[in-house]
């Protein structure tokens, strides 16, 4: 369900005859529309944002949407609440201007503002992207805004498997637009469903060499190349791609986990263990990946470090014991706070969770400055944020259940893996420390006496610029 922008207009048109516009600490506003509009414009130029927003809102209340300056006043209102950090309210005002098309001269400005807001975290994805941009029929936009709309409409068509529509929308994006490369990447990723990996690789390699690639898109391209290399068991190639982006994707702990798996399959057990230790950094505490404990145990097992491997395997229960207990007790998923907390950190569930967190943060920010808006605008913003918070909670609950099911399945699978590893460890102890010939060749890492690299002993303190360089130089106790 998307936010109905008629709700905004309806609130704005509520009769307000006789409302006092002055209050404690607030300047009185004129009842003359021309004076109100001039006051809003002057205050905006002087960066008096609450005063400008008050005057613009009162002007809108004193007239109707057919007024020639109604949308200009709403634009002033949107710009000033945005300047105050109230992005959600601003997005709805911009959306009303773009969607209603009362003043076609302002539609492009409103769409450009929506583009700016969509670059930020925690925006209302369902209302702005999936509701308006995906289906809007807007003409007369400048090339940049036209490319922005075409890109999002093409993405929506791809999500609905409407390939012809997606191709047609993407073809409208000029070659010089930054959205052109994003559209090409989206088409390539969609073609992965055909499993024609060689063709996909070739197209990705070409795209990765394009000029002026945004950093986030470049990271995604190399990440995808790395994942394809991993699936094709080209682990050296996968690591090469991951190494290209690890210093520009420091906020993505799942990248370290993928690097750890690649190192494990190459026999780089010390390096794999170092990357897994890095995942214990407080900055990465939100990562929910039960498999990491299995990988740690498997890496230690390959070094015939049987007791550390056993301890590593049991860390799964130490970290997710409450969630596992709920699963074994057959607690309904919606009633498990442990599984709910884990699901909120899932990448696919991050958008609704971010929207909810952002709404709470922004509502708190509004509450701090509420009295500066005067009673009428404050009441209107109260309604907007009350509705937005309710909708954010509803959306997260709706999507979170699917994430909770995925987390539950991963936890149970990892728990079964732990049982198998513990069994293998028991067998290995009886068998001795002879290395299985089927295992990859162990690559020992030794600290050199000289050289260009400097090695430091890890003291338990994590530093962002060093966290992905950790190595665990455990002794290989296996016998060849």
Model-derived segments and spans:
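N-terminal leader/linker segments that initiate helical-solenoid repeat arrays
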Residues: 24-92, 104-111, 126, 148
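Solenoid-like repeat scaffolds
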Residues: 26-29, 59-67, 95-104, 132-143, ...
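"A position-specific structural signal for the A-helix of alpha-solenoid helical repeats
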Residues: 38-39, 76, 112-113, 145-152, ...
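Residue at a conserved register position within TPR or TPR-like alpha-solenoid repeats
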Residues: 43-44, 81, 118, 157, ...
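TPR-repeat structural position
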Residues: 49-50, 87, 163, 197, ...
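Single-residue signature of alpha-solenoid repeat helices
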Residues: 52-53, 90, 166, 200, ...
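Extracytoplasmic/secretory-pathway proteins
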Residues: 56-58, 85, 89, 93, ...
